[in-house]
Amino acid sequence: MEKVIANELINFLYESPTAFHAVKNVKDTLEFEGFKELKEADRWNLEVQGKYFVTKNDSALIAFRVGKGDIAENGFKIIGAHTDSPGFRIKPNPEITVENTYVKLNTEVYGGPILNTWFDRPLALAGRVSLVSKNPLKPVNKIVNINRPILIIPNLAIHMNREVNEGYKINRQKDTLPLLSLVNETLEKGNYLVELLAKELYCEKEDILDFELYPYEYEKGCLMGLNEEFISSGRLDDLSMVHAGIKALMDAEVSQATNVMVCFDNEEVGSATKQGGDSDFLKTILERIVLALGKDREDFLRSLSESFMISADLAHAVHPNLGEKHDPVVRPVLGKGPVIKIAASQSYTSDSDSSAVYEMICRNAGVNVQKFVNRSDMRGGSTIGPISSTHLPIRSVDMGTPILAMHSIREFGAVKDHFDCIKSFTEFFRI
C-alpha cells in the first residue's frame, strides 16, 4: 500500500508542474469525490457535513468539510501547505538571439533553487496564459503545459571553465538562460514563444496578452533504492504535503470540528500576495464559513480559540555525506517518520503545547515522530506557519516529512514517511 500511495504522489507531481496545474488537479479530484466549488463573489449557503472548496488566482485553494458539531464550540482543524516550488520564470519578450543562430529565453529566478541542478537537463514549459476578452477586467486565463523537452541550460565545458568543480559562482542573468531553438525562418522573428503558445492553445497570437511560464524538469519522478524505498522527484517541497493533506481530508470521517485543507501559493517568495499565506485569504474564508452556517462574528472569534493548525512543509533530513551540517543531537533521518520543526527564533510556530498535540496524534495513528532544530550557528528557513499566525491567532505546529536535496530540481524522500504523514493527517481530521 505504501508504494501504491507513493506512485500516486509521483503521478500528481508529474501532472502538476506549476501551482496552477496543482490546483487544477486538486480541484478535479475534489469534484470527483463530491466536493462543491464555491465562488467568492456568491452568497454561500452551507450544510452541516457538506464538502466544499474555493480557489484563488487559479493557484491557491481551500477545501473543507463542515463538522457535525457547533462550529463556535468545536472550531476548525486546519492543515496548511503550499503549491509553488523554486525554479525559474520566463520574462516578457524573452527571446534572445545569439550568433544569429541560437534562440534562448530570458528568465528570472523564482525563490531559492539550487541553480546547478538545473543544468544539462531536458526542460519542459508550463504555466498560465492570459488572453483578450470582451470584458477588460476579466481576461480569459488558460493553463498550458508544453510537456515536451524543448529547453535546456547547457553547461560550459570544463576546458573553458577549469574552476567549475572548485565552487564556480553562477550568474543568474547570464548563466541560467535556457536554449530554445536554432533560428528558423518559418517562425516570426522575436515571437518564437508566442507562436508556440498560440499553437498549444489553438488561438491567435494577437490574442495573447501576457503569461506566467515556468520551465520544469521533463523527466518524471520515480521510486528508487535497493527496495524502492525512496522517492526521487521534483516539487516534493511542498506538493507532497498538498497531496497528503487532500487525501486525508477526503479519507477521514466527518468529525465534530470543521476540517480544512489550505494550499497557499508564493511561499517560496515570501507569501505576500493575495493568494499567499501572508494574506487574509484563509481568515476570510473561515469567517465566511461561520457566517454561512447562521452564526455571527462573535461565534467566529470563539471558533478560533478552539482551532488548531498543522503547518505542513518539508524538513531537512541528516545528509549521509554531510552530517556535521545538522545539530549534534537532534538528527531526523529518512524513513523514521514526520518531523516537528522547532526554532527559538519563532521561525516555526511549534511550541511545547502544539508539539505535544501532534506527538499524541502520531501516537494514536501508530506513527513515529521526529524533531528538527537548526545548528545554533546556522540560520534556517521559515514557512507559512508563522506568517499565517500573524493573521489567525490559533495554536499551530510546524512539521513536514524529511527529505534530502531540498530546492534541488529533483528532491529525495522516503516512501514510508509520506505514507505515515497521511496516517497522521487522517487521524488529526478524525478526532
Residue ranges and their predicted role:
Residues M1-I431:
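N-terminal hydrophobic/helix-forming segments and targeting peptides
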